[in-house]
């Protein structure tokens, strides 16, 4: 039973800040219009393993951490809030 509990916490610690699938691209976006459209988005320059790291990294650049569909010309058409961020 103890192994299961430890394995469960280890797995959740390794969880990504963005879900797999459509919204799998972590981006730092200057603006999030209607909580749906990311504007002036940039790829993080460090590994963003946790929501707190992702949030701090984007905030240092004046941006918001978002999980988006593949961006085109620095514009992400569909974005959602990253896991573990506020």
From Swiss-Prot:
Traits of the deletion mutant: Leads to wettable and fluffy colonies. Results in thinner hyphae and impairs the formation of aerial hyphae.
GO cellular component: extracellular region; spore wall
Keyword ATP-binding on entry: no
Disulfide bonds: 18-67, 28-58, 29-41, 68-79
The keyword Disulfide bond belongs to this UniProt entry's keyword annotation: yes
Compartments where found: Secreted; Spore wall; Secreted, Cell wall
Induction data: By C and N starvation, and by light.
A Pfam family hit: Hydrophobin_2
UniProt keyword terms in alphabetical order: Cell wall, Conidiation, Disulfide bond, Secreted, Signal, Sporulation
Cleavable signal peptide: 1-15
Function in brief: Aerial growth, conidiation, and dispersal of filamentous fungi in the environment rely upon a capability of their secreting small amphipathic proteins called hydrophobins (HPBs) with low sequence identity. Class I can self-assemble into an outermost layer of rodlet bundles on aerial cell surfaces, conferring cellular hydrophobicity that supports fungal growth, development and dispersal; whereas Class II form highly ordered films at water-air interfaces through intermolecular interactions but contribute nothing to the rodlet structure.
Complex and partners: Homodimer. Homodimers further self-assemble to form highly ordered films at water-air interfaces through intermolecular interactions.
Family: Belongs to the cerato-ulmin hydrophobin family.
PANTHER family: HYDROPHOBIN (PTHR42341:SF2)
Protein name: Class II hydrophobin 2
Originating species: Hypocrea jecorina (Trichoderma reesei)
Lineage of the organism: Eukaryota, Fungi, Dikarya, Ascomycota, Pezizomycotina
Gene designation per UniProt: hfb2
